[in-house]
């Protein structure tokens, strides 16, 4: 016998977004359903932060990350390579560790975690300050979908620039609200 639904799907037309939404849409319009995406975003970034802390050696002791780590630890100031000034923002947390006299493993752990915290901060600014859920979701999806390709190549400034771009785009779209 073939499978039959006990009730046919009831689709409603939503003129706001021009989408056909399933019959359960009214149930999704509750206070809890509005908090779930926010919670999911923060949970995902918390997991990414925990992963960055757990895999700090794999993330910081290879290739460019090790080279840049050596330079900012030895100099005690941000290591700006090839005019990539965005790298200074993620080197501030490990530099605080250097200035406080923390061990090498602690400084490298802070460096590994600071990359994820940068993206989490961009996500939080879009979500909570600018009230732009779409930009926040874009940052979240960008980080989750590219984590397989970029998780261990952490100091790629392009990824930081794209997260920052979402924040700046969100600010640009709201420029008339502030005038």
Regions found by a protein language model. Name each.
Residues 167-178:
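Membrane-interface transmembrane helices that cradle and orient dolichyl/undecaprenyl
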Residues 126-146:
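Transmembrane-helix signature of polytopic, membrane-embedded enzymes
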Residues 100-120:
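Loop-to-helix entry region of an early transmembrane alpha helix in multi-pass inner-membrane enzymes
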Residues 113-133:
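Transmembrane-helix motifs of polytopic, lipid-linked glycan transferases
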Residues 140-163:
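Aromatic- and kink-enriched transmembrane "portal" helix at the membrane-lumen/periplasm boundary
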Residues 18, 22-50:
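Start-transfer (signal-anchor) and selected internal transmembrane alpha helices
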Residues 53-71, 80-93:
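Extracytoplasmic catalytic/substrate-binding loops of multi-pass membrane glycan-assembly enzymes
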Residues 5-8, 13:
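Cationic, low-complexity basic patches in intrinsically disordered or flexible, solvent-exposed regions
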């Amino acid at each position: 016998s073939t499978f039959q639904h006990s009730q046919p799907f009831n689709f409603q037309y939503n003129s706001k977004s021009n989408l056909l939404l399933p019959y359960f849409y009214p149930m999704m319009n509750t206070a809890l359903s509005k908090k779930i995406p926010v919670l999911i975003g923060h949970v995902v970034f918390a997991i990414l932060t925990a992963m960055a802390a757990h895999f700090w050696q794999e993330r910081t002791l290879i290739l460019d990350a090790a080279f840049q780590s050596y330079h900012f630890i030895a100099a005690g100031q941000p290591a700006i390579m090839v005019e990539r000034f965005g790298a200074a923002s993620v080197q501030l947390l490990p530099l605080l560790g250097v200035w406080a006299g923390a061990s090498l493993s602690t400084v490298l752990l802070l460096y590994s975690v600071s990359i994820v915290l940068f993206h989490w901060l961009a996500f939080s600014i879009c979500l909570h300050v600018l009230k732009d859920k779409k930009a926040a979701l874009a940052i979240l999806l960008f980080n989750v979908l590219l984590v397989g390709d970029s998780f261990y190549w952490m100091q790629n400034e392009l990824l930081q620039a794209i997260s920052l771009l979402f924040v700046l785009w969100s600010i640009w779209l709201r420029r008339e609200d502030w005038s």
